[in-house]
Amino acid sequence: MTIRPAYRPKIIKKRTKHFIRHQSDRYAKLSHKWRKPKGIDNRVRRRFKGQYLMPNIGYGSNKRTRHMLPTGFKKFLVHNVRELEVLLMQNRVYCGEIAHAVSSKKRKEIVERAKQLSIRLTNPNGRLRSQENE
């Protein structure tokens, strides 16, 4: 039986389009990743009509759904079995995510313990391989 979140609202983003860097469409050497314009005459910085929009605090997500996954859980990074037990009382709000640097031996232990504590993991199959027949 899978664990379901205690509270699962509809996640609404105020803006789904990415903020792109000024003149990144004009020059290939400029990446599309956002950089705040600092020039004294810059039209984007001065917020002229028809220019790219700048990110600001008003585009932030709802406080209740911020950092929430589409499943309705919030992520918690787990490096060992002991860190998994922090989620014991919060298993309907948080789900564990096994850290990148964890070995496959420790991953197996974490997955087993999570199943016992009924804690959901986002990546339970990561770097786990069943034995191949020879």
Curated annotation (Swiss-Prot):
- Gene Ontology CC: cytosolic large ribosomal subunit
Q: Name one GO molecular function term.
A: structural constituent of ribosome
InterPro entries (alphabetical) = Ribosomal_eL32 (IPR001515), Ribosomal_eL32_CS (IPR018263), Ribosomal_eL32_sf (IPR036351)
Q: Which UniProt keywords apply?
A: Ribonucleoprotein, Ribosomal protein
Q: Which domain of life is it from?
A: Eukaryota
GO BP term, pick one: translation
Q: What family does the Swiss-Prot or TrEMBL record give for this protein? A: Belongs to the eukaryotic ribosomal protein eL32 family.
Q: Please report the name of this protein according to its UniProt entry.
A: Large ribosomal subunit protein eL32
| Gene that this sequence comes from | RpL32
